[in-house]
């Protein structure tokens, strides 16, 4: 993928307690990101993964798993509904050939956007306070699994109230 990331910085125990008691930052740019759009994108995604996309409203994110034609799990990750017929999938494994093969017969466009989207995950009980000090107080009204557009220092970004720690957290997505 072209990324090199450390397993930990300094002391993993210290990192754990920082995330549980204050906040920690993770570079999530290496996650594989796909854009799926088109008139039949909802039906297409319903065929590939376990959640009903009709229930996922624009501006929301859901956690799900992708399955092959036999129902075996291929990978898990998140689906962002950016607009009515516009989605982003974030996952660990590359699967563009499978996504393209699965798109045959659907009026959809599937493309990888991993290199075009960078991400940082800010997790922990003081994550909001940190972002509020940066001028992002409007995050206070976000519910878990919301995603919204913001601008900070003339830099447009999407911020989702998501994360993998089980605590308060945000993922910040920008075009580098």
Regions found by a protein language model. Name each.
Residues 1-176:
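Glycine/proline-enriched, intrinsically flexible loops and inter-domain linkers
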């Amino acid at each position: 993928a072209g990324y090199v990331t450390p397993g930990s910085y300094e002391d993993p125990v210290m990192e754990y307690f920082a995330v549980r008691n204050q906040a920690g930052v993770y570079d999530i740019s290496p996650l594989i990101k796909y854009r799926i759009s088109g008139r039949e994108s909802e039906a297409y995604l319903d065929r590939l993964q376990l959640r009903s996309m009709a229930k996922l409203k624009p501006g929301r994110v859901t956690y799900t798993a992708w399955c092959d034609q036999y129902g075996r799990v291929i990978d898990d990750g998140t689906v962002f509904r950016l607009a009515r017929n516009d989605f982003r999938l974030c996952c660990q494994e590359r699967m563009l050939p499978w996504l393209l093969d699965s798109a045959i017969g659907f009026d959809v466009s599937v493309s990888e956007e991993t290199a075009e989207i960078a991400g940082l995950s800010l997790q922990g009980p003081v994550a909001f306070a940190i972002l509020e000090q940066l001028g992002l107080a409007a995050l206070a009204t976000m519910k878990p699994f919301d995603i919204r557009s913001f601008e900070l220092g003339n830099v447009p970004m999407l911020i989702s109230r998501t994360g993998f720690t089980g605590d308060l957290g945000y993922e910040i997505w920008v075009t580098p």
